[in-house]
Regions:
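Alpha-helical transmembrane segments
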Residues: 6-13, 179, 188
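Active-site flanking residues adjacent to catalytic metal/cofactor-binding acidic residues
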Residues: 20, 82-83, 142
């Protein structure tokens, strides 16, 4: 009888674990964050050819790591260059970022060439490497602090939570390691410690 109850208890725990894992993935996009790569020219950028959902919002990056559809040579192209304001992040749906709204309303394709904390020098370095994509015009939108934030090539990709280079194996691992632990025990203990190291591999 005791052994049977133990089996039932384990089965219930496994069911809860699996159900929560599926829910975190399907409804919240855990273990599905946009990934980044390092660049020797412009520090970092979102990896190319990504498409997914995160916290209910759609994100899409084309073959040039732009948060846009592929450049369309049949349309007038304008380059939108900037930092997190233009980038939008995962809390802004693909259709709601400024460049998507502009493209939808004008018929002009505005390519979104941006990343969090990018400054003018990041944008210039990207264009020097990738080209101008046949653009007729371009504009730069950066906040006051990013306008003077020169590239220093500090390692942030895979080091800082905002710039992951690989997915968590389990949504549970991301929930605990990236959100719950740093905001609770991590603050009390003054750092990531062993738990963060372990959950980053989960």
């Amino acid at each position: 009888m005791v052994r049977l109850k133990k089996k039932h208890f384990i089965a219930i725990l496994l069911t809860i674990f699996v159900a929560t894992e599926v829910s975190l993935r399907q409804f919240w996009g855990f273990a599905n964050a946009p990934l980044y790569y390092e660049s020797q020219s412009y520090e970092y950028m979102a990896r190319p050819n990504q498409d997914g959902y995160r916290f209910g919002n759609h994100y899409h990056y084309n073959a040039y790591s732009q948060r846009s559809e592929e450049p369309d040579s049949t349309k007038v192209i304008v380059l939108g260059l900037g930092d997190s304001v233009l980038f939008g992040g995962v809390m802004t749906d693909q259709d709601s970022i400024a460049t998507s709204l502009f493209s939808a309303e004008t018929g002009v394709q505005m390519l979104n060439i941006s990343a969090g904390s990018w400054g003018p020098d990041n944008c210039a370095a990207y264009l020097k490497e990738k080209g101008l994509f046949g653009a007729r015009a371009m504009f730069l939108l950066v906040s006051s602090h990013d306008a003077h934030d020169n590239m220093d090539f500090k390692e942030v990709v895979g080091k800082h939570a905002s710039y992951p280079d690989k997915q968590y194996l389990f949504a549970w691992g991301e929930l605990i390691g990236r959100y719950v632990y740093p905001r609770t025990l991590g603050r009390l203990l003054g750092g990531g410690g062993i738990l963060t190291t372990l959950t980053s591999r989960c």
